[in-house]
């Protein structure tokens, strides 16, 4: 009779342990997945912040200031052309700005930088929301002042200048979609 009680107790213990293992597995998988997603999100934010640090630590900040200063000097002329929807005139004015060697060099530096940032965001390797907060203002200023020129310099199939337009066009996402970036984001 004692061997039957031991056998019954062993079966009950095995069933309880099996239940606990199953429960732990069922609860552990979502927790592990959430941890993985949070880590990936933090990695994307860190990459975006590293671009921002590179922007601030290098001469890129000074380059953007120079470019904006030169474009702002022609802001009234630019606005008159925009009001008339004179695309050829806008391109001509922006091209005349880039004829200055300092402006040309600064624009080249900035375009190369944004050509690294844009695809990083477009392919969800960098966080879009962090990029918006840290770098979109500068991209918008540059597209406003030099967008027609950069667009005119692009060649079919070549990625030159795409990054600045990618960063310029970013829209803030909801918090849940930033944890799951793959369904909604596409490369331009």
Language-model segments: which ranges?
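Membrane-proximal alpha-helical anchors
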Residues: 2-90
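Short, charged, low-complexity loops and linkers
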Residues: 88-98
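An amphipathic alpha-helical interaction surface
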Residues: 96-188
């Amino acid at each position: 009779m004692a061997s039957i009680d031991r056998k019954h107790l062993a079966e009950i213990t095995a069933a309880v342990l099996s239940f606990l293992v199953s429960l732990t597995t069922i609860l552990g998988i979502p927790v592990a997945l959430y941890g993985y997603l949070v880590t990936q999100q933090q990695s994307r934010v860190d990459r975006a912040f590293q671009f921002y640090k590179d922007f601030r630590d290098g001469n890129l900040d000074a380059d953007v200031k120079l470019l904006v200063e030169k474009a702002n000097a022609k802001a009234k002329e630019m606005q008159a052309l925009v009001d008339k929807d004179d695309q050829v005139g806008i391109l001509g004015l922006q091209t005349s700005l880039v004829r200055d060697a300092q402006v040309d060099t600064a624009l080249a530096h900035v375009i190369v930088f944004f050509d690294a940032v844009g695809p990083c965001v477009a392919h969800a390797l960098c966080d879009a929301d962090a990029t918006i907060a840290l770098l979109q203002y500068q991209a918008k200023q540059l597209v406003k002042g030099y967008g027609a020129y950069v667009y005119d310099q692009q060649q079919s199939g070549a990625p030159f200048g795409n990054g600045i337009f990618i960063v310029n066009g970013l829209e803030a996402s909801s918090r849940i979609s930033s944890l799951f970036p793959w369904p909604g984001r596409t490369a331009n």
